[in-house]
Design a protein with these regions (language model features):
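Single conserved hydrophobic/aromatic residue that forms the stacking wall/gate
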Residues: 1-8, 12-13
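Glycine-rich phosphate- or other oxyanion-binding loops that anchor nucleotides, phosphorylated ligands
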Residues: 14-188
């Protein structure tokens, strides 16, 4: 659907990641489906960088973690909690997972111009979808529940599965990245 906004859009990669390339306002743009989670998103970013890409925008979905983050709102991430494993292959855990400020500001400007309700802030990034949704069924459920409460108290806006990896991979590769998400449900 996003690729339909591009002029002269053509599918250029079919095997691992479906990718369309075309132009938008006379700028060459590629749209890639990376699948779910940090590992596949990191592979896509690495391979797209090798093809010359230098700016990335992750568009996806998330679950709201604060009561004012409603279904249908947009969340623009200003940082990500590294509760996943991919980013650890690129940088020590002390290194922050933060997006490029210019890309983030452009995302905020775009969301404002459309009049969508939105929030900016930190998101929680994890590897397991069901660990969060059914922690009581997991051997580490106690830890998951306590971390969830800590993230909420610290003001974390939403939960998703790619940003931390993409932010750290982008830092390691010297490219720009930002992310925004449609809230599909509020988990509170």
């Amino acid at each position: 659907e996003i690729a339909s906004c591009l002029v002269g859009s053509e599918m250029c990669i079919r095997d691992r990641y479906v990718t369309y390339t075309g132009t938008l306002d006379q700028v060459k743009v590629s749209v890639t489906s990376t699948g779910i989670g940090g590992p596949s998103a990191a592979i896509a970013m690495e391979e797209l960088c090798r093809c010359g890409a230098d700016t990335f925008i992750r568009i996806g979905t998330c679950g709201g973690m604060q009561t004012d983050v409603k279904s249908g709102d947009i969340v623009v991430s200003t940082g990500a909690i590294r509760m996943e494993g991919t980013s650890r292959e690129y940088a020590p855990i002390e290194f922050p997972a933060v997006p490029d400020l210019t890309v983030t500001n452009a995302l905020v400007k775009a969301v404002k111009s459309k009049g969508y309700p939105f929030h900016t802030g930190v998101v929680q990034c994890k590897d397991s979808f069901y660990g969060q949704h059914e922690p009581e069924r997991k051997p580490v459920g106690y830890d998951l529940l306590h971390k969830w409460e800590a993230w909420k108290q610290l003001g974390c806006l939403a939960s998703e599965m790619e940003s931390a990896a993409l932010f750290v991979v982008a830092s390691s590769l010297g490219v720009r990245v930002g992310s925004c998400f449609l809230v599909i449900a509020n988990q509170e």
